[in-house]
């Protein structure tokens, strides 16, 4: 059981763990609880009615949040020739092929997302043991294995996030910063929620979205009503 600091415990007293709020109320609460000296990240956790041990219930993908996450992301691109030039022009932070593979094998990992063109995936495969555990391996399901490198880079820089259900059936994702206004956070939240609803596996039975919890980096979680997935953005 992790130990929490005095400030967290004081904040926890303000949150009724049995109370389930509408999304706007929950977002207001999270913003009030985000009192750290840095701009805390607002995160959401969806507990889904899936069993990720079965391949047909694994949920993984990516979505561009309309207002981004508030965090700048460094992009490394594995590509050759014209595609390498295209990546550089699009604002990639590192571009290469064999040379980039060697650099990473040497311990360099100063990037947040990796993109690769399909023709160099044989090379990138050598980095599986290094990049895989860190969630940095390019993957067609998240749009990071593509010949359209310019678009991939632009989407990532604009606020594209990847999501993946963990072994307990939960998806954790950042949806912005505490400094964002509530409406922007809600629109990011709604975009991700709509994406997950569309991604519901046919094999998933029973209630799909079992619970939703919002929190900031340092705050306790605030529960959101999972039975009202739409009409969440109406101004109060």
UniProtKB/Swiss-Prot annotation:
**Gene Ontology CC: one annotated term:** large ribosomal subunit
What keywords are assigned to this protein? Answer: Repressor, Ribonucleoprotein, Ribosomal protein, RNA-binding, rRNA-binding, Translation regulation, tRNA-binding
Gene3D superfamilies listed in its UniProt record: 3.30.190.20, 3.40.50.790
SUPFAM superfamilies noted in UniProt: Ribosomal protein L1
The record's listing under Pfam families reads: Ribosomal_L1
**What does UniProt give as the signal peptide span?**
none
| GO terms of biological process kind | regulation of translation; translation
A GO molecular function annotation here is: rRNA binding
Quote the subunit structure annotation: Part of the 50S ribosomal subunit.
Q: What does this protein do?
A: Binds directly to 23S rRNA. The L1 stalk is quite mobile in the ribosome, and is involved in E site tRNA release.
The family annotation for this protein states: Belongs to the universal ribosomal protein uL1 family.
Q: What is this protein called?
A: Large ribosomal subunit protein uL1
């Amino acid at each position: 059981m992790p130990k929490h600091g005095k400030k967290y415990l004081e904040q926890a007293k303000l949150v009724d763990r049995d109370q389930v709020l509408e999304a706007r109320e929950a977002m207001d609460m999270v913003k009030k609880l985000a009192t750290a000296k840095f701009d805390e990240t607002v995160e959401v956790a969806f507990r889904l009615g899936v069993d990720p041990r079965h391949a047909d219930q694994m949920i993984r993908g990516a979505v561009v949040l309309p207002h981004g996450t508030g965090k700048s992301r460094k992009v490394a691109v594995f590509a050759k020739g014209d595609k390498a030039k295209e990546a550089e022009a699009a604002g990639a932070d590192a571009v290469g092929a064999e040379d980039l593979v060697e650099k990473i094998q040497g311990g360099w990992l100063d990037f947040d997302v990796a993109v690769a063109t399909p023709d160099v995936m044989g090379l990138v495969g050598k980095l599986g043991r290094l990049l895989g555990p860190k969630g940095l391996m390019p993957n067609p399901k998240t749009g990071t294995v593509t010949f359209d490198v310019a678009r991939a880079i632009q989407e990532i820089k604009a606020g594209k996030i990847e999501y993946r259900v963990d072994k307990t059936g939960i998806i954790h994702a950042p949806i912005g910063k505490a400094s964002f206004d509530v409406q922007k956070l809600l629109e990011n939240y709604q975009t991700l929620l709509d994406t997950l609803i569309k991604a519901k596996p046919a094999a998933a039975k029973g209630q799909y979205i079992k619970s939703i919890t919002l929190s900031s980096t340092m705050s306790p979680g605030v529960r959101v009503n999972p039975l009202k997935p739409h009409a969440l953005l109406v101004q109060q």
